[in-house]
């Protein structure tokens, strides 16, 4: 399979195999007017299998969303067909409006204008909890 190179944009690389669609949805890439390529289960010498997302064009991406889904992913910034920056991600301590609280008793269920805020409570397990009701993010 051949996917063309990127002129200006970014490559989200080293995504754990099977996680790219979740990332695609959370980043809102379906709204992108630029070219987006999603590659699932690409062969990787380091990971065995991995997913990759290529964005050819300008589309704002929240790095905290990527780090929440897969903190081992890397970001490659491409300008004029050349890799100009490589970013490693840090697990975010706080997520705002990235995921919604699923607890029907949470105040965010009735107060629609409230931000959905989750904090990292168990860094070793990647567990986030709602600041209002302490429900775990799914």
Predicted regions and their residues:
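Cys/His-clustered metal-coordination modules, chiefly Zn-binding fingers
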Residues: 84-138
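Interaction interfaces in information-processing and related assembly proteins
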Residues: 1-87
């Amino acid at each position: 399979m051949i996917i063309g190179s990127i002129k200006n944009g970014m490559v989200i690389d080293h995504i754990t195999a099977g996680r790219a669609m979740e990332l695609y949805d959370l980043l809102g890439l379906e709204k992108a007017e630029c070219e987006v390529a999603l590659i699932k289960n690409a062969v990787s010498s380091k990971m065995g299998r991995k997913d990759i997302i290529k964005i050819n064009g300008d589309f704002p991406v929240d790095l905290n969303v990527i780090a929440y889904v897969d903190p081992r992913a890397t970001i490659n910034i491409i300008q004029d067909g050349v890799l100009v920056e490589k970013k490693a991600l840090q697990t975010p301590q706080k997520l705002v409006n990235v995921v919604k609280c699923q607890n029907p008793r949470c105040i965010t269920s009735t107060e629609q204008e409230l931000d959905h805020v989750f904090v990292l409570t168990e860094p070793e397990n990647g567990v986030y909890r709602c600041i209002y009701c302490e429900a775990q993010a799914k």
